[in-house]
UniProtKB/Swiss-Prot annotation:
The lineage of its organism: Bacteria, Bacillati, Chloroflexota, Chloroflexia, Chloroflexales. It catalyses: UMP + diphosphate = 5-phospho-alpha-D-ribose 1-diphosphate + uracil. This is Bifunctional protein PyrR. A motif (PRPP-binding) lies at residues 98-110. GO terms for biological process: regulation of DNA-templated transcription. Gene3D superfamilies: 3.40.50.2020. Its EC number is 2.4.2.9. The gene is pyrR. Keywords: Glycosyltransferase, Transcription, Transcription regulation, Transferase. Regulates the transcription of the pyrimidine nucleotide (pyr) operon in response to exogenous pyrimidines. Also displays a weak uracil phosphoribosyltransferase activity which is not physiologically significant. InterPro entries: PRibTrfase_dom (IPR000836), PRTase-like (IPR029057), PyrR (IPR023050), PyrR_bifunctional (IPR050137).
Amino acid sequence: MGEKQILDADDIRRAITRIAHEIAERNAGVRDVALVGIRRRGAPLAMRIAAALEEIERVRVPVGVLDITLYRDDLGIRGPAPVVHATDIPFDISGRTVVLVDDVLYTGRTIRAALDALTDFGRPARIQLAVLIDRGHRELPIRADFVGKNVPTSRDERIATRLHEVDGGVDGVFIVRTTATSG
């Protein structure tokens, strides 16, 4: 099982800055924009995007954290006792543009669960999606509005995102081969 680094800390910083510029441009500013990071690695990415938006627009954008554990369609498959974490959305999402943030977009099932969970908290005017990595292989008709990097992968590869807020150490994104190849 090998891994290959595809983004380092500087690449991630540049991607976040670009995503922040795109969010501000697409929404003609950030007056009614809020960010909601999907728990685990989407949450620190949302905080970083918010910091970049504040630097660009001189406006503090509200940030929340969404736990989707009980909304997943693979709940029974993943194990007997899922660990549920707190959702923290300390603002009203109704009438706002909410940008959902996650680290990797793959099948679309995590985002479907996040949409279900998010709408339990109100009725946003619109929901947009920002991801650091889009790796393809969609199973649902979901696409990201803002993408740090498109990384085509095979089904026997996965993307490992490491963020210092969650994992310690240095930021990076890696392609990890999950099965041995015959050769």
